[in-house]
Amino acid sequence: MPICSLQTFADALPPGRPVLGLDLGTRTIGVATSDVRLTLATPIITIKRRKFTLDVQELFALADGRAAAGLVLGLPVEMDGSEGPRCQATRAFARNLLALRDLPVLLWDERLSTAAVNRFLVGEADMTRARRAEVVDRAAAAYILQGALDALDRQRPEQAF
């Protein structure tokens, strides 16, 4: 399956299974999960990056353990909307991952996600710099995933209660 549009991603997801959100960095990968109703993102772990094959093995183990139906990868678009080297690296990561496993992958604009998470962790959670460094990547993954989940929710038809 190629990298999906939002609609294709939504159509490819089976009901009752979560998705994982990833914040890819050069040294770490922040990972978050959704609930099975695809409404709430929760940070779960930060993976220290090693080699691609080892990183993907760990991601696949997490996905399998949670029965995840797809992946949302943060796409680090520049502020002017252009795609720089980090976007190219994220797209390459997604293509290489898809060469190993066929699953829905959505690239989601992550502009300012880490900055927003840092502001929250400093202002609201009153975390020290050391503690923030431990959680910022997985919290950014949850922020990215929540944005995608909210967009998926807006695409669903209204249901009468």
Curated annotation (Swiss-Prot):
E.C. code: 3.1.-.-
Biological process (GO), any one: rRNA 5'-end processing
Broad class of the protein's primary localization: cytoplasm
Keywords (A to Z) from UniProt: Cytoplasm, Hydrolase, Nuclease, Ribosome biogenesis
InterPro entries from the UniProt entry: RNaseH-like_sf (IPR012337), YqgF (IPR005227), YqgF/RNaseH-like_dom (IPR006641), YqgF/RNaseH-like_dom_sf (IPR037027)
EC class: hydrolase
Single GO molecular function: nuclease activity
Function of the protein: Could be a nuclease involved in processing of the 5'-end of pre-16S rRNA.
Alphabetized PANTHER family for the sequence: POLYNUCLEOTIDYL TRANSFERASE, RIBONUCLEASE H-LIKE SUPERFAMILY PROTEIN (PTHR33317:SF4)
UniProt similarity note: Belongs to the YqgF nuclease family.
Protein name (database record): Putative pre-16S rRNA nuclease
